[in-house]
């Protein structure tokens, strides 16, 4: 469950390391879960990379510490809150995705992120 001012790890190689959520996209929404798009500001970044510190970016949430209930009754949760930076078309800005991602991303049409991920849970 991600809300304003929440810090997230970045799960790609775009150059950013930490994001802070400043807005959850959607009409009057307060919380974001796995597969939701947020507006975030880069709080920590590597030098000489495309994404710089204090850049305002779009990102899709790929992991949350808040447990996620599936229709089958299974409950999954991850060890951290993480996001992948995307462009306006919904494609990732990086070329690699680190760590596992949730299967719900495929239902939300983020198939490029799912195909780059090393593990889909």
UniProtKB/Swiss-Prot annotation:
Name of the protein described by the UniProt record: Large ribosomal subunit protein uL14
PROSITE patterns reported in the protein's UniProt record: RIBOSOMAL_L14
Assembly and interaction partners: Part of the 50S ribosomal subunit. Forms a cluster with proteins L3 and L19. In the 70S ribosome, L14 and L19 interact and together make contacts with the 16S rRNA in bridges B5 and B8.
GO CC terms of this entry: cytosolic large ribosomal subunit
Assigned keywords, A-Z: Ribonucleoprotein, Ribosomal protein, RNA-binding, rRNA-binding
Family matches, as SMART domains: Ribosomal_L14
Origin organism lineage: Bacteria, Bacillati, Cyanobacteriota, Cyanophyceae, Synechococcales
Statement: the UniProt record of this protein carries the keyword Ubl conjugation: no
Keyword Nucleotide-binding (UniProt): no
UniProt organism field: Synechococcus elongatus (strain ATCC 33912 / PCC 7942 / FACHB-805)
CDD domains noted in UniProt: Ribosomal_uL14
Pfam families: Ribosomal_L14 (PF00238)
Gene3D superfamilies (UniProt xref): Ribosomal protein L14
GO molecular function, one term: structural constituent of ribosome
Protein family membership: Belongs to the universal ribosomal protein uL14 family.
Membrane-crossing residue ranges in chain numbering: none
